[in-house]
Amino acid sequence: MEIKQIKAREVIDSRGNPTVEADVILNDDTIGSAMVPSGASTGQKEALELRDRDKSRYLGKGVLKAVKFVNTEICDTLIGFDINNLSKIDQTMIDLDGTKTKSRLGANTILSVSLAAAHANANRQHKPLYASLNQGGNYKLPVPMMNIINGGEHANNNIDIQEFMIIPVGAPSFKEALRYGIEVFHHLKSILEIKGMSTTVGDEGGFAPNLASNEDAIKIILEAINNAGYKPGKDIFIGIDAASSEFYDNDNKTYNLISENKSFSSEEFVNYLAKWVENYPIISIEDGMDENDWNGWNLLTKKLGDKVQLVGDDLYVTNSKILKQGIERNIANSILIKVNQIGTLTETFATIKVAMNARYTSIMSHRSGETEDTTIADLAVACTCSQIKTGSLSRSDRLAKYNRLLRIEEELGTQAVYPGLNAFNHLN
């Protein structure tokens, strides 16, 4: 079936900023649509999103240029293409852009069409997206990494560490894992209220209180887990996204925790994180070191690589070439997958394949600026990513993905496998 038309429009994301939505329409009038997300803390090597920079509209964040590229250049090029050949569609857009970082057309522009094409193909096949894209026949529901305390670039508070997550590995199913997380979330809210702390939420739906230290976030989460009737380190583990690049001083080569008035060398910050791992049931650390501090990453991997999932986000930016370099240097043991970091579905799948071949785990992830689009939920299942990050247990832009996963689990029935702790089976 061939592409008949492609069109795009400006829509609004969860931070009140414009983003791109594209429709791919086939000759039989089948339609596939997708909206693209946007990040706040971004890696330096990410593919670049295109913004209008016209200060008279949306403070310069409009995407009319991206919309025009879809409606003209991309549409004119892809009309008549076979929708079943998604990789050819993606490669044609990559070639049309002609830059290493997709800076001419914009990664957001290209991605909107890449994802919409996948949806159109699935709809043509009368299949859900996860089934249309799945090639292995096995279906795993991802373990959710629920960001219940927000800090850093995702909140207006004094916490340096960007995300404190709960990971319900002890649940027997995704549905029950979601229940575990929601119950802990509500107990955490009660604790914060009793302590007279703020229960406002950050970009990703987690609470954003001011705390005496970053470590206090872990302690208060453990209290909530216990109050909910679960066992830390058995039913529920903790994960953190340090987003260290956001507080790394490149000139002085130091990690500066402003809220604690502390400064660390790379080795000292590795030891700081290692102490947390020793004292608390932490199973995953994302971006523990700055994206360019590869020597620091080596130290961190040697120290904790057999004990904790070490996730590269800003480090790898969903780029298979950078990931291969990291694998060769034995840096980290996991990669965060964000489709808009690389800009096409084909390149995303290629990166996941590289990770799988190296026995690195892959974590499908949202961005802090999201929409009601649920594509990443299907992608997590289609690619058998063992985990998913899609925020906390509030804000409809986050819960839309959780609700989609509930429906997928129900559809799959006995075919649905929730891996639980096995999602981390590369650890001792």
Curated annotation (Swiss-Prot):
The active site is at residues 204, 338. InterPro entries: Enolase, Enolase-like_C_sf, Enolase-like_N, Enolase_C, Enolase_CS, Enolase_N. Binds a second Mg(2+) ion via substrate during catalysis. (2R)-2-phosphoglycerate binds at residues 162, 338, 367-368, 389. Its cofactor is Mg(2+). Mg(2+) binds at residues 241, 286, 313. Disulfide bonds: none annotated. Its main location: cytoplasm. It is found in: Cytoplasm; Secreted; Cell surface. Catalyzes the reversible conversion of 2-phosphoglycerate (2-PG) into phosphoenolpyruvate (PEP). It is essential for the degradation of carbohydrates via glycolysis. Component of the RNA degradosome, a multiprotein complex involved in RNA processing and mRNA degradation. This is Enolase. It comes from Vesicomyosocius okutanii subsp. Calyptogena okutanii (strain HA). The gene is eno.
